[in-house]
């Protein structure tokens, strides 16, 4: 019988390493692949060098270096993202290029929490990473067990400061390097055969147990951003787009949300894909949705079709933003309060006015900043929604809605 027939049945979870430079994120990422590969032939090992030279990818007009690895435990299949540079982390988390269901915070026991440790925890809070598990690395370099307790306490305090449950978060102590060196010596090392390898398994157990399996997109309330609208003579108005979440079928009541002064309700009279009728459209499908009693003028690109009551239009919000550097194709100069770029949400640009927080005079290219935006038209918004900031069609920043104001 073929090995690896079970792959599809395991729940899938997205994770990633975060933490200060040189605390061992990439070494740990490599160790996770080696350790799980010893027990599972489906896992491909990735060594430090493979992960460190991460390929460039583009998300919302921004170039980001990101390494993706995959591994599995008996319970789950994981996609894991690791970024080589600090700026890459900021860009990655703000654009949501690699969404994380949970993060592994790596802290060197020899150094304790450092500036980027704090910055990454803050970012995780702002962009809505729901769970953090801590790996206290390099414990072989610290002789005094009391020092380890102290570092653990500092990390827990820091997590509490940013509204993570610091007292409940699992903290695993180990050495990614010693585990990786053991796996290099004997790639078949199993759980129970080496204390450092066992620490990696302890981390995997914590990830399995502590980070819940996310609700699949298809089980969330229906939402489809409208990309295009046309009329089918004799049948009515069709809105096309890719279903972002949930499902839709004939007879469902939906709301048309955003851009218009009023949200209006209508009923789905048909769902089509490549000109063929569908029983039901689900998350990820590109479909045309036929709407009852809606004229061609009453629905437009940039609106969303959604399950009634699941999302509302707003004009004012707070956002966490990364401003592109000049070398990344961004602005050459800073900007002030009153700056009026376009904000690109899902399928459309809407002009908005930026209000910087008290004490911040100016924002420079390369900055990571939080500010308030007031849009000239209402858009279907929710916390965690990503957007691009554009000027004359080019991307100058990326952001995520952290709080809806009105």
UniProtKB/Swiss-Prot annotation:
Enzyme Commission number: 3.6.5.3
Q: What are the entry keywords?
A: Cytoplasm, Elongation factor, GTP-binding, Hydrolase, Magnesium, Metal-binding, Nucleotide-binding, Phosphoprotein, Protein biosynthesis
**Gene Ontology molecular function terms on file:** GTP binding; GTPase activity; translation elongation factor activity
Q: Which reaction does it catalyse?
A: GTP + H2O = GDP + phosphate + H(+)
Cellular location(s)? Cytoplasm
From the UniProt entry, list the residue stretches annotated as the region G1.
19-26
Q: Where is this region: G4?
A: 137-140
Q: Where is this region: G5?
A: 175-177
Q: How is it modified after translation?
A: Phosphorylated on a threonine.
In this chain, the stretch annotated as G2 covers: 61-65
The entry marks the following residues as binding GTP, namely: 19-26, 82-86, 137-140
- Which cellular components does GO assign to this protein? cytosol
Where's the tr-type G domain?
Answer: 10-215
Q: What class of enzyme is it?
A: hydrolase
Matching PROSITE patterns: G_TR_1, G_TR_2
Instruction: List the protein's name.
Output: Elongation factor Tu-B
| Organism of provenance | Thermus thermophilus (strain ATCC 27634 / DSM 579 / HB8)
